[in-house]
Amino acid sequence: MAKSYLSDYIQHCMSFYIRYRNPVFNTKVDELNWNACNNALSNMSVYTKDLICELYKDASRDNVIRLAAENNMSEFDMWKLLRAIEKRIAKERGLI
C-alpha cells in the first residue's frame, strides 16, 4: 500500500526532530513541526522514544522487521507503534 501524504509529512517532521535536538528554526513551520514531535514524545519512556527515533531514522520495512526482532516485538506491534505516533504527532500539529 502506498504511503499517505500525512505519513510522508510526519516522516519529514520526525527527520528534522531527530537531526536537530536543539534546533535553530528558519521558519515558523519548522518550529511548529519540531514542537509537535517533541510534545507527542514528551510523556513517553526513554526506551519508547529511542525506539521511535530509531524507527524514523529509516522507516523501511526491513528496519521495522529488524527492530521488532531486536526488541522482541512482533512486526505488527512495531507497525502499530509507528501508526500510533504518526497519529499523535498529526494531532499535535493540528493536521487531523
Where are these regions (language model features)?
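Short amphipathic alpha helix immediately N-terminal
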Residues: 43-62
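N-terminal interaction/assembly modules
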Residues: 1-43, 66, 70-71, 93-96
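DNA major-groove recognition helices of helix-turn-helix
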Residues: 78-92
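Helix-turn-helix DNA-binding module
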Residues: 58-74
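Short amphipathic alpha-helical segments
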Residues: 32, 46-50, 80
